[in-house]
Design a protein with these regions (language model features):
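C-terminal subregions of glycosyltransferases and related glycan-biosynthesis enzymes
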Residues: 108, 114, 136-214
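Nucleotide-sugar donor-binding/catalytic module of glycosyltransferases
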Residues: 1-148
Length: 214
C-alpha cells in the first residue's frame, strides 16, 4: 500500500472507463448515486468533475448531519484554498481522467483536492446539493463556516498562516503542470506570493479567491 493519494493515481492510470467514481470501503451508497452523477455530467465534453453532497453518519449509521450547505459556486478561486468534496462523492469523465494521467502529482495534499483543482482549471465542476451517500464521520465532526465577509476574512487568514507547508507545495507543483489560463495563473501566483506577510492583505481582499467554509 503506497497511501491513499498514490494508490488512487496508480489505479487511475489503469482505467479507461468513460466515467470514474471514487469509493471508500465503509460508506453506504444510496440508490441512483451513479446514475445521478452520470446524468449530471454526460453532456460535457471538456474535463468535468461531479461532486455530490453527503449525509454524515456515525459508525452505526446514525445521522449526524443531513448535508453540507454550499451557497457559493465551485470554481478555481475556491479550489486553490480548499477541497469542497470528499473523494467518495466524486465522478469524473474520461476527458478529465486523461488530463490527470498526463501529470501524476507527487505533492498533492489529497487526491480529491487535486482533482478539484484540475477540473476547475481545465473545465467544469458540477456540485450536486442533493446527497446520495451516507458518509461515515471518523474523528472530530466537520465544523461548518460562513460565507459572510468576516467568515471569509477569518478563513483566508487561517489558510495563509498554514500555507507554507503541504498546501504551498501542492500549488507549486500544480503551477508546473498547468499554466495556460492567464487569469487563473495570476490567482495561483497571488497565493504563493502570500507566504510573505507584506502581500497577505492582497489575498484577503481578493474576492475571486474564496472559501465555502469560513
Amino acid at each position: 500500500n503506497t497511501g491513499v493519494t498514490d494508490s488512487f493515481f496508480e489505479l487511475l492510470k489503469k482505467s479507461d472507463a468513460d466515467y470514474i467514481a471514487f469509493c471508500d470501503q465503509d460508506d453506504v451508497w444510496l440508490e441512483q448515486k451513479v446514475e445521478r452523477a452520470v446524468d449530471k455530467i454526460s453532456s460535457f465534453t471538456e474535463p468535468t468533475l461531479y461532486i455530490g453532497n453527503k449525509i454524515l453518519v456515525d459508525a452505526d449509521l446514525n445521522i449526524i448531519s443531513e448535508g453540507d450547505s454550499r451557497s457559493l459556486k465551485p470554481g478555481f478561486g475556491n479550489a486553490l484554498v480548499e477541497s469542497i468534496g470528499s473523494g467518495c462523492t466524486m465522478m469524473m469523465n474520461r476527458s478529465l481522467a486523461e488530463a490527470l494521467r498526463l501529470h501524476i502529482p507527487k505533492q498533492a495534499v489529497i487526491h480529491d483536492w487535486w482533482c478539484y483543482l484540475a477540473a476547475a482549471y481545465l473545465g467544469t465542476v458540477v456540485y450536486d446539493q442533493k446527497p446520495y451517500i451516507w458518509y461515515r464521520q471518523h474523528g472530530n465532526n466537520e465544523v461548518g463556516g460562513s460565507d459572510s465577509f468576516f467568515g471569509q476574512l477569518k478563513g483566508k487568514i487561517r489558510y495563509l498562516k498554514k500555507s507554507r507547508g503541504k498546501l504551498a507545495k501542492q500549488l507549486e507543483e500544480f503551477k508546473q503542470y498547468y499554466h495556460s489560463d492567464e487569469k487563473k495563473d495570476r490567482q495561483l501566483q497571488e497565493l504563493l506570493d502570500a507566504s510573505a506577510v507584506s502581500k497577505r492583505m492582497k489575498v484577503v481582499r481578493d474576492k475571486t479567491i474564496y472559501r465555502q467554509n469560513g
